[in-house]
Each structure stands twice: as structure tokens, then as C-alpha cells.
Amino acid sequence: VLRAHLLDTAGKKTDVVLSATLFERITGMSMKARPATVGGFAQSIHDFQGLRDFLTAVTLTSLIDLPFSLLMLLVIGLIGGPLVFIPLLAFPITALFAYVIQIRLRDTVQKSLQLGSQRQALLIETLGGLETLKACGAESERQHQWEQTHGALTRLDGHAKFLASLATNGTLFLQQFAGMATIVAGVYLIIAGNLSVGALVACYMLGSRILAPLGQIAGLITRYQQARLTMTSTDALMALPQERQDKQRPLDRTQLKGALEIRQISFTYPGQNAPALTNISLRLGAGERLGIIGRSGSGKSTLARLLMAFYSADEGQILLDNLDLRQLDVADLRHQIGYVAHDLPLLAGSLRDNLTLGARYISDARMLEVAELTGVVDLARQHPQGFERPVGERGQLLSGGQRQAVLLARALLLDPPILVLDEPTSAMDNTSEDLLRQRLHKWVQGKTLILITHRASMLSLVDRLAVLDNGHVVADGPKEAVIEALRKGRVGPASL
């Protein structure tokens, strides 16, 4: 009991440390290493529990008993003479039987874990796209996929349980057979006068004790295979490329002025063949306000992600205050850039939680100031819980325009010197957008602003305009001159 308790305590401590380290690696991983399916990735993390179960299993204590089996064999040889050959022969036969079952079980468990990841991915995708399924009338199609996946998984689990049961019962049979053989052989030795009854009883008890650990180890076979595969996936998670490299010593820049230079950068998303950006060059002085327009898929949002250091350019440089972006600590960088993405979800929690995300220390006065500026204060006034109003998972309890207002308020909360706004009003109505634009006009003065938009009215916030098309800058200059060139067809297409 004490041994099992100590193992369980050690396993719990190991679990806490490993799970914390694992989550740290996940949140710190490079966006290039982000998995294609969230569900399968989540299942891999969930399977980590199987590793802890294996390490804390009571049957794992049987491994400690194995060395004592050799000592018991010596004792049987001393008191029972030739009877020692029965457990000596049964021991390797039992081990060989368990090993053969383990080989058959390995492939089954591996396929089972893969199907489990597919099922988890299917479930998460279904829950996230439930409205889409209902709108398209595709519930039955998804139901069929679920039944097929779950049915295959059930069959594999049943086969794995059968093999595990075969290993356990087969080992038990060999134990009992060895015990019977010991008694039968011992009787003949007693008749011949070469063994006493007491020695036979002792040999029988010691022989059973020798084979007992093998019976317990047979019960570990299934857990071992799951733990082995889980360890492989855990190793892959721990090896994920990180944003912060241990050998790097980033520069500490707690206050940036906002001068920005993009030098001939090119970028291709992982797993894609076509480049998203090709030979992009732009230069902004501190406090300059640039609007970026272009058709969907032209690379505007990709450029914003590179500026936030979510990804690194394959070629070229991005300089901020004459320093390469890769020399700056990503936390310091993002702390000084107000970023809004058109498809960025909110997190489950309250309005206050999302407004002050990453800046819980901010004062209520500052929070109210940006809430007034962006119109978020109206969301609090309209609800009896005020700023404790729940927003739901991914902000589903708010409209698209309301979510964008919250995101914009959060971007302005720390009064950053640089703003990167990617379609900040795409889901807002005209009235809300006009009111927000009027309030922002004074606030953005003196700040470096990069505004990506399809709304012509929002361009009143910028003095300069660049046009992206198919990953290239096809126009860059004063706003009025670029708009005039677009009207006359002297530059590539843009979406406004």
C-alpha cells in the first residue's frame, strides 16, 4: 500500500510539471508549427493522461518484484532441487507469450489513437460549424461520418480489449499450469524420498510468487502501448518550434517611436506553393498613416501578421526604429502595437475580461476611456451586468460589429505608438462606423497607423495609400494621387 501511494504521489507531481511544460510549449509555439486540425491536436494533449495512468498504475510495481524472482529461483533450487526447472521454463514461455500479444496489440492501439484523433477533430469541427451544417441541411451527412468513425473505433477498441484479455488469461493459465506441474513433480519426488511435504509447499508458494509479476505485467501491455504512442506524440509536441529560442537574447525596447521599413520581403505559408507576398517594400516614418487596399487574397492580412511577428518573412527584412523585427522580444513588440484582425475571435468570459486581456492591471478609468471611444460602453449600459456581461464562446453572444468594437478597444487600451488595423469596421453598420471614424480621427494623430480596409470612408484616417495585388505592391503614394490613378485605370485593381 505504501509503495503504491508513493508511486501515485510521484506520478501526480510528474503530471503537474509535465502538463505545465507542455502547455507552455503549446502557447509559445511558432505559428508556422500550428497544426492543421485543432481537434486532433487537442486529442493528442488529452491522450497525455494515458501516460500518467501508466506511470501511476499499481501493476507497475510488479517491475520492482522482477529482481526478487531470481532470488526465489535460487531458493527453490536449494530446497526443491529439480523442481526449479518448472518455473525456470515457465518464466520465459510466459514472457514470450506476452511479447507476441504485445506485437499484435501495438498496431491496433496505434490505429485506435489515430481514429480517436479523427473523431475528436470531427466533433470540434461540427460544434464550431453547427450553423453551417443546419443551413446546408448536412446534418445527416455529418452524422454518417460520425457513425463510420465511431464504429471503426469501437471495433478497434474491442479487438484491443480481446488481445489484452488474451494476454491476461493466457498468463494466468500458464501460472496455474506451472503450479500443477510443480505439485505433480513434487509428489513423485516425495514418493522417491527426495523431497519433504513442507519443501513441496514452499516450492509451490515460491513458484507462484515468481510468476505473479508476469501476470501483472501482462495487464500492463495495453497501457504500455498507449503510453508508448502517447510519449511519441508528446515528444513531437515538446519539439514544436518556439517563438522564443533559448539561445536568443532579444533587445529590450520598452518604448518604440514607430518608424517602420519593409525591405523586399517575400513569404509563403507553410504547406503552400504559391507565395502570399513577393518582394514587398514600404517605408513609414514615425506618426505616418498608411492605408492598404486591394482585392481579397492580395496579401494584406498576411502583411499584418508579419508585422506582428506571427510569422517570419522567408526573404527580406522588417525594420522597426531601424532594428530588425527578429531582434526584438515578441512580447515587447506586441505590447506596443495595437492589432485588430477582421477574423479574430473573443474568448469566453466577460466584456471586462476581453477588454483587459493581457493587461489586467489597467485602471477602470482607462478602460472606460477606450470603451467610450469605441462605443463598447453602450454594450455595458444595455446589460444589467455591465462590464461583467458574458460574451460567450468566441464572442457568439455579440454581433459581428460589437465584437469588432471590443477588439478595437482592446487594441487602444495601452495607448500603443503603432496601430495595425485589419478591416476594423467590416462588420459594423454605417452609423457605427461613421461615429467611430470621427472619434478615431483625433486619437490617431501622431501615431503610426497601418489601416487595411475595403471601406472608402475609412480612408479619411490616412494620408497615404498603397495598393496590393496578388502579393505585390502595385501603387504607393499620396492618397488622392493613388485614388485618381485607380479611377483612370493606371494601376492594378483594388477593392473599395
Which positions does each model-derived feature cover?
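Transmembrane helices of ABC transporter permease
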Residues: 1, 61-111, 184-195, 212
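Transmembrane-helix motif of ABC transporter permease domains
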Residues: 1-15, 86, 96-97, 197-198, ...
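Juxtamembrane loop-to-helix connectors within ABC transporter transmembrane domains
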Residues: 7, 27-71, 128
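Cytosolic ends of transmembrane helices, especially the final helix of ABC transmembrane type-1 domains
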Residues: 8, 115, 135-138, 162, ...
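Loop segments that connect adjacent transmembrane helices in multi-pass transporters
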Residues: 20, 24-25, 29-39, 111-160, ...
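ABC-type nucleotide-binding domain
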Residues: 253-496
